[in-house]
Amino acid sequence: MAKIIDARLRDNVHLLGELLGNTIRAQHGDQFFDKIERIRKGAKAARKGSAEGAQLLAETLDSLDESELLPMTRAFNQFLNLANIAEQYHQVRRRAAGEPAPFEIGVFADLIERLKAAGHDNEFIARQVSRLEIELVLTAHPTEVSRRTLIQKYDAIAQQLAARDHTDLSDAERASIELSLQRLIAEVWHTEEIRRNRPTPVEEAKWGFAAIENSLWKAVPNVLRQTDATLHRLTGLHLPLEAAPIRFASWMGGDRDGNPNVTAMVSREVLLTARWVAADLYLREIEGLITALSMREASDELLRQSGDSAEPYRVLLKPLRQRLRATREWARAAIEHGQPAPAEVLQDCAELRRPLELCYRSLHACGMGVIADGALLDCLRRLAVFGLFLVRLDIRQDAARHAAALAEITDYLGLGDYQQWDEQKRLDWLQHELANRRPLLPAHYHPSADTAEVLATCAVIAEAPAASLGSYVISMAHAASDVLAVQLLLKEAGLQRPMRVVPLFETLDDLNNAAPTIDRLLSLPGYRQRLHGPQEVMIGYSDSAKDAGTTAAAWAQYRAQEQLVEVCREHGVELLLFHGRGGTVGRGGGPAHAAILSQPPGSVAGRFRTTEQGEMIRFKFGLPDIAEQNLNLYLAAVLEATLLPPPPPEPGWRETMDRLAAEGVAAYRGVVREHPLFVDYFRQATPELELGRLPLGSRPAKRREGGVESLRAIPWIFAWTQTRLMLPAWLGWEQALHGALQRGEGERLAEMRARWPFFSTRIDMLEMVLAKADADIARRYDERLVQPELLSLGSDLRDRLSQVIEAVLSLTGQSDLLDHSPKTQEAFSLRNTYLDPLHLMQIELLARSRQRQGPAESPLEQALLVSVAGIAAGLRNTG
């Protein structure tokens, strides 16, 4: 294959690999390093079909004694991590003169030009941009495989690569940078990759806050500055100071669904920690502004507040500094001692914003606009986006927990068992109690521990400032009563204001019933008065795909959104769809820009809310420059989906998609649910059980005891990713596409792919995940780990993988997957040289681990866990 990847990227990867080699040699000697090189060269040759290479690889791996397994897995893991750093930096490195800018940089300006060409006037475009409401919800699972300590070192390596890119370096300066890189890589090598203990929910939340502090805090004002400049250049209008087209929310410390470690006290601590972090960040901003705004000239409006002073701006800003210090000190004291807030504590964003806006107006009025539009404007932009609370905390709980709490209450009150009531009886009682002025619970009521925790969570919500909270999400919602149940529990806790209570529909049946459920809800007397803003509905991608396969799940998600748009239109209510996407294709993941543009027409309408998952937060927002690129994509995609939506699909396309979905779900469930040996095969062929020992996040891997249905979507995906079968992302498509092609529907499929963004995006994401799949690697897991009676099932699944690859190639007209993207092909090829040895070592480690069942801290178990992390790094995803 001709070398397509940029020479500078190759140079950085080579340099980092060489420095890692120096570090390994220094600790383990030349002989050990030579084994690494033999394994790498053997893997590279074996990939090209060399029998000698395959033999060299096998012999060298067989020659490793047990003490060498851990450092060997660490070597390949760290090389893949370093390759990721080089790739990530390459995305944002300075471009040489004449080099084309990345797509992400110009996407917003290109869109404005297209909107104008489509007949939209300047005022309309500017107004739509200022009204955009995009909210990215940071979640903790799948939590980063990499430890936060290592992530900080990886970021420092990226900074040194940027420094090395300067063209005017002296030899001494270049040598100094390379010495710094050598030192950082040595620090990485001598730091354990795997946490000894699971993080607590509060630690997860702090990880999320760190992503904001280290990257998004800088990226957001830069993006809004660029957006404003583009808007002004192309329309003559500015983005208003108060505009916040992108905001952030979080599930870290609020998502208690299936996680007993997230309690009411944890959510309270996370809310206070967010206030502390926000106050600390703004304090640094204000101190910088006090230093910068030393000038005397000021408007009469400002002088009326500052009095006669040589430094009027400082007079206005110094009290803000004191109040931010007081807010920060109180937040810490409240976490430790539950101390009430003194009067000096900032409670409302306007208390901080008004003096800053006054300074801004005064500077412009006095001819100092260039000063106003610097750090002061950035601070105002941050304030509009992050507010006083940094992120809005969502609360999530399973509908069954609310029903159980109400059943306990109705039983205590002598009304019977709420859980046994039909839907109409539940609604009648809930409506009556919501309208009743008296409390539901008598003062002497003593709930069980589970019910007390539900009530305590509602009490924390009632006490927290409204602006610190996002939505209350009800997972596994089935009916209108699920929403009213939460509203009643919040009323009982003393909540006096409306809060968004959001049903999450996440199985195939629930997605199909989503629109009728919302229709019934909006028809209930009194419900509209309790509705806070738009009707928010969450679409579950992960669990619906695990339930029905991605073919049927994707179509059910699309149709549910179409129907919800229609229902809300009939009721005259605005709709906000909240997309619960994962990081992987099997959990609804994929490129955000394409995904947004493939939504049904009318479903975006200027609003878009979506989860950003664990490891994807680092890949998409870990470095400020990369965060800027991804935020640009969100802005452009949501604006385009709003003003240039795709046309509705043709009736014939719908019929074809109905058939594909029906055949897909039958094929998927025929294997996953109905094959009697599937669960045994899954547990033997993948490291699913071993993944439960990996301290990934605060949340247990299972909801309850049982088979595949009890597994959370993340370990389900993660396990198949490790073996490279990638089964959840494609199972069902092989039957659906093969059947359609056999029926002579190839032209129809090609037309759908060419003209329907929904279908083309699905096929593109399917192709990407198939390019990561590797039947030969999956076969090796089977041969070493699976009992003989289960081997035929593995063989059948690999045959199905071949079928779906053939179908996709037929549909795309390519000879090989990703022929249209040779750079991506080459990147995968380079990674396989380092992934193949990790897979082979993992297979051996799994076999030995299952024979011995040693303690988690033994070198064997540590090597196994490092292999898991390494494969995740090589494939750029976990679950």
UniProtKB/Swiss-Prot annotation:
Known PROSITE patterns for this protein?
PEPCASE_1, PEPCASE_2
Active site: residue positions: H141, K546
Catalyzed chemical reaction(s):
oxaloacetate + phosphate = phosphoenolpyruvate + hydrogencarbonate
Question: Which cofactor does this sequence's record say it needs?
Answer: Mg(2+)
What is a single cellular component term in the Gene Ontology annotation?
A: cytosol
Q: Give the Gene Ontology MF terms in alphabetical order.
A: magnesium ion binding; phosphoenolpyruvate carboxylase activity
Q: Which top-level group of life is the source organism from?
A: Bacteria
Name the keywords, alphabetized: Carbon dioxide fixation, Lyase, Magnesium
* UniProt-listed Gene3D superfamilies: Phosphoenolpyruvate/pyruvate domain
Q: Which GO terms describe its biological process?
A: carbon fixation; oxaloacetate metabolic process; tricarboxylic acid cycle
What is the E.C. number?
4.1.1.31
Family from the record: Belongs to the PEPCase type 1 family.
Its biological purpose: Forms oxaloacetate, a four-carbon dicarboxylic acid source for the tricarboxylic acid cycle.
For this entry, the protein name equals Phosphoenolpyruvate carboxylase
Which species does this protein come from? Stutzerimonas stutzeri (strain A1501)
